């Protein structure tokens, strides 16, 4: 099987003429370097992956999560090249998949989902806010590696970062909920954001997909289903091969490695594991889990670090080696869209069990939700203050961007960009400076 990819996929929006002597790196090696050295990537070290009330420093940050996802991504690619060698030409290089996994979370705001909901609510009349859309915006526009095009990454890298290839105006619910009487009474589940690309970044999205045929462009933005309610968002069906690998790496890191955090920090008990995951994993239909689920539980909760690591590694390996490349169920012409990496059905079910367990017993528990709620309030307070008197309160560079914006929505987007880039600690400190009665 031969796959010819047009050189357009290695192009950058801005045709750079960098002063670089004897630079023999591939476009994707250069992309990886830009991401790794960016301020947006560094900030991930101070954005927590799972918010709890523990004082321990064992837990993962968004940065360590991204590093683990990158390691998993290169592992997936390596085993696919051996397992299905006919796709060797089409599969991403290590530098490309590394780039996608390292960058996939850089648009996430402080305080995780709480911060995302807060910014989406404050931006409800100005195009919304969503973490993946913000990632695309950072790499294509905001990160100051270039003057106008962010990191100026290659086109294939940008396509791989787009998990939801449609504009938010296409995926957003027909109606929005009524605004809360007071921000303290805001219900987070009512304001979870629609997934997609900001409408204000349409020109950059159009540039990324320009090499595709009209048929492929049309198919790419198709939705999975028609929502049952006018208040329900739509969701896109398709993504590129590279993106499908990155997403699997992200999901495995979330479902398995975040589980490890929860066990070490005492957030889940063995009984909860038995009731919430072990029995379903034993019945998922995969022989590996049926055979090993008992010993996995013993090792995870043995209290011995090496045994827990062995169990985690075993689950990761079982999932990773169950991934294969399959044809997408629509007639895409471009091979980057015609094929996706997928878990075998039984293992997909097992990963869903793990992700649901982490969500139910780790993310949705009160001690985590209290921190997210507090963060949600902090972000809304800051947004309200900055948008009330931006020329007085914004830093000089951000104020200049605000002044140069030509519409109200553009001005609000500048404020959202500024707040979403903050670390958890930066947001907390600014909130104290704005609202605490203690003189700082």
Swiss-Prot record:
A Pfam cross-reference name: HD_assoc
Keywords on record: Hydrolase
Family membership noted in the UniProt record: Belongs to the dGTPase family. Type 2 subfamily.
Domain HD: 62-255
Organism: Vibrio parahaemolyticus serotype O3:K6 (strain RIMD 2210633)
Keyword Hydrolase: yes
PROSITE patterns the record matches: HD
Entry annotated with the keyword Hydrolase: yes
Molecular function terms, GO-annotated: dGTPase activity
Gene3D superfamilies, per the entry: Hypothetical protein af1432
PANTHER family: DEOXYGUANOSINETRIPHOSPHATE TRIPHOSPHOHYDROLASE-LIKE PROTEIN 2, DEOXYNUCLEOSIDE TRIPHOSPHATE TRIPHOSPHOHYDROLASE
Protein known as: Deoxyguanosinetriphosphate triphosphohydrolase-like protein
GO terms, biological process: dGTP catabolic process
